[in-house]
Amino acid sequence: MEVAMVSAESSGCNSHMPYGYAAQARARERERLAHSRAAAAAAVAAATAAVEGSGGSGGGSHHHHQSRGACTSHDPQSSRGSRRRRRQRSEKKKAHYRQSSFPHCSDLMPSGSEEKILRELSEEEEDEEEEEEEEEEGRFYYSEDDHGDECSYTDLLPQDEGGGGYSSVRYSDCCERVVINVSGLRFETQMKTLAQFPETLLGDPEKRTQYFDPLRNEYFFDRNRPSFDAILYYYQSGGRLKRPVNVPFDIFTEEVKFYQLGEEALLKFREDEGFVREEEDRALPENEFKKQIWLLFEYPESSSPARGIAIVSVLVILISIVIFCLETLPEFRDDRDLVMALSAGGHGGLLNDTSAPHLENSGHTIFNDPFFIVETVCIVWFSFEFVVRCFACPSQALFFKNIMNIIDIVSILPYFITLGTDLAQQQGGGNGQQQQAMSFAILRIIRLVRVFRIFKLSRHSKGLQILGHTLRASMRELGLLIFFLFIGVILFSSAVYFAEADEPTTHFQSIPDAFWWAVVTMTTVGYGDMKPITVGGKIVGSLCAIAGVLTIALPVPVIVSNFNYFYHRETENEEQTQLTQNAVSCPYLPSNLLKKFRSSTSSSLGDKSEYLEMEEGVKESLCAKEEKCQGKGDDSETDKNNCSNAKAVETDV
């Protein structure tokens, strides 16, 4: 044994730490750690008791300072220093055991004991670090508030309702995310994105609350899924609304109305789609008498007398147009021309010697001409209608800017100009044959303007109004069509002229003469009065016809699309008007809703929510009526019929 010890010392082994001594050292180290942990737990308990007792009036300040002292003893710097010192001690232990290994002393230390000792030390070090981290999580922290610095102990970090830690309140206000479920398709965005438009459905927290699903913590909308991509992009882009290609226009418009993006966004979207801005609702006069007159002449659907006035106006317009056409017949035209020439003063070269004395002796003048009398009656009605509408209109400036009122003025003025000219010539006498012929030609041109009276029918025709809206919305396409035709006419007229220049019997004597042929060919009419003869001219004609088909076909689909839009919009307005009229005439509608819809000046429902409110009121009234019928057995036959037809009335509404 002594020989082994001596040999160990001589070989450089550290013989003062055999295997038994190393085990005793590890046991003492564990004991020391257990004592230190117990002391730390006692200190924590004392600090907790001090904090809880700090609320008392007597010893509040003492416990407060004591707790603060405890807090300062466990600041982050001291904890980091203790961890550093403990790590250094662990490294020293490892180095000590490496030096005290006995590679040549097999009798004192078993084989493999060195690796086992180092592994146990590493495990103890990891356990100590984990315990230190847990203790650090449970240490004291400072929270600053209005009352100063306070120290409290907790095992968890301070939490708030947003779950964001110390600064979670501000973080949740600006970066809180929201989930929107649209028919099973989930979208995720931030609250601040939706808050850019607080007047919309998604931007107003109160409006979107009714769609919130607390179980899944999301907002659910049973709406069109492809449309919501554009709706969400409206919030993300700051107000840009673009319809997806795979969504029809009417469906996307309904979605925009549902999410309450606003009238301005809807109007801008329609302008981007190529539609004109819709006319604003025409206001009614404030004066009650003017209001009734305005409704009588402007809104035929407002009452039965208004409908009767509209029928009379249409009949007068038709009579005026028929008279305008009949007076051009040969059997009426000769006599009327003679009367017009006679009233122009003198009959020099305009009347022959046999017809003039006959007309003068018979007393036949323009004032007793049957056509003139009928024309006068029509003009009296037109003038009366125009003056009354001008008197009762809400705004004189807007009244004279309306195209229909301008047409009324243009259709009335020729009569008074003709009448004034006739009276002036009769009083002044004849001033020469040339002046009389000039006056006669001017009167004919003025009388031609009466043909614009046919446009007065558009006031009472929905189809003509739709056509007018379509043409106004398609002005850009129509201008493009005319521009293409103009280029084609110039190009092919020049080409056919030079192609037919060497032909003596050609119809194209000049380029302007070929304009007519180019227009007729490009519009695929082909009268045949002018046609090319040479081979080159026929080739030019073929190309002209093909180019005309392509030129006309390009803008036509856009015009047809505009017509379909205005037609469907008018059809929907008529359906909503019918629903409103049925609702107002329904005997089961509550009195408050009935008064609301009767007081409405619009002929259609502006929002579906109003119709849903009306439908809900009808259902409540029907339920009350059914309960009344079931509770009373001796009701009259009328009440029984009303109760039995309750479902039918509900279906109609």
From Swiss-Prot:
Quote the biased-composition stretches of kind Basic residues, using this chain's numbering: 81-97
Positions of short motif PDZ-binding:
651-653
Task: Please give, as recorded in its UniProt entry, the membrane topology of this protein.
Answer: Multi-pass membrane protein
Q: Where in the cell is it found?
A: Cell membrane; Cell projection, Axon
Residues forming coiled coils: none
Q: Name one Pfam family in it.
A: BTB_2
**Keywords attached to this entry:** Cataract, Cell membrane, Cell projection, Disease variant, Dystonia, Glycoprotein, Intellectual disability, Ion channel, Ion transport, Membrane, Phosphoprotein, Potassium, Potassium channel, Potassium transport, Transmembrane, Transmembrane helix, Transport, Voltage-gated channel
Q: Which residues are glycosylated?
A: N352
Q: Which residue ranges does the UniProt annotation give for the motif Selectivity filter?
A: 524-529
- GO terms for cellular component: axon; axon initial segment; dendritic spine; membrane; plasma membrane; voltage-gated potassium channel complex
Would I find Aminoacyl-tRNA synthetase among this entry's keywords?
Answer: no
* Example GO molecular function: delayed rectifier potassium channel activity
Tissues expressing the protein: Expressed in brain, and at lower levels in the testis, lung, kidney, colon and heart. Detected in heart ventricle.
Query: What does the subunit comment say?
Result: Homotetramer and heterotetramer of potassium channel proteins. Interacts with KCNAB1 and KCNAB2. Interacts with DLG1, DLG2 and DLG4 via their PDZ domains. Interacts with SIGMAR1. Detected in a complex with KCNA1. Interacts with KCNA2. Part of a complex containing KCNA1, KCNAB1 and LGI1. Interacts (via cytoplasmic N-terminal domain) with KCNRG.
Stated name of the protein: Potassium voltage-gated channel subfamily A member 4
